Every structure is written in structure tokens, then in C-alpha cells.
Amino acid sequence: MSKNFLTNLDKSKRNKNVKVHEFFYSKSSNETTINFSKITYQFKNSTFGKTLIMNSDMGLCGLAFCDDLGKDAVLADMKLRWPKASYKQDTIFSDKEFRSILDKTKQVELCLLGSKFQIQVWKALLKIPTGKVTSYTTLAKYIGKPKAVRTIATAIGKNPLCWLIPCHRVLRANGELGGYHWG
């Protein structure tokens, strides 16, 4: 196994440039703890290609690569995550500000909406240092659910903030890509 492969996240430091606001929803009642009235979005070019960035009053709530799907499909997918919001396309960040967010040199507030389990997984992903990778199994053990590897993989696949929440740093135990969206 590579020296970059983490088998324990307990000693990892969380990215200090990220502040997380958590909002939960209940699958049984389809109710959320927050109701956004407006999300502003824009498409920016990045080293990863065309990128969708979404912002609410509480912070960034969406970051997605348009890759082969195209802008319309990616925007439609992200809108499903925030069904009660209204959307407006507008300039959110200058090119310089956007690069500083992707480079993680700018303080950024993230607004996460998901189940308590999903948010627990996404926050654990923030513990993986730049340049390191870990496995679904290690992540499952870290959050205290060692048998929930597939459920964790599903939560990772629903990560609304690719790159900032590093789902791409989680691999199968054998070091191969898992194939869950961007991770």
C-alpha cells in the first residue's frame, strides 16, 4: 500500500479554511431544517473543465463538474438536492476568487443539506489531508459504522461539493477507484 494511503483518520487535521453549516432532512417526512428562498449559481471554467458553483445565504451549497453530462444535466441534478429553492444565474465569484476556493487558500463556508448520516460522512471526508487517500472501510470504521461500507459509498456519491469535500480521495481497499460519481 502507498505511503499516501491512510488507514486511520483519527490523527488527521481538518482543513482550517472550511466552516460547515449543517442542515438535515428527514426522508420519512420530506421536511428540512432550513428552507432556502434563493440559490445563485454560475458556470466557471476550471482546470477540471466547465464547473457549476452554487451559493446560498449560508455559503457554498453546490460544486459540480459538468464533464460529459453537460451544463443542463448537471444543473438539473444539483437542483434536485435543493427542491424548495428558487434559482438565479448570476456572477458569484471572480475568476481569482474561484481559483482561491479550488486551491483552498480562501476561507469558505459550506452549506450542507442531507441526512445526519450523509453529513457525518461528508464531514469525515474533510479529515482526509490533501495528497492522501483512504478506503471506504477506513472511513466506515472512523465514523463508527464498520459494516456500513456500501451505505458510506452511496453517501459519498451524493456529495454536493466535489473537490472541496474530497470524495475523490476514497478508494476501494485494494486501491482501485470505486466509481461513485466523482469518487
Identify the meaning behind each predicted range.
Residues 147-183:
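Short glycine/serine-rich loop segments
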Residues 1-146:
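Basic nucleic-acid-binding alpha-helical/helix-turn surface characteristic of O6-alkylguanine DNA
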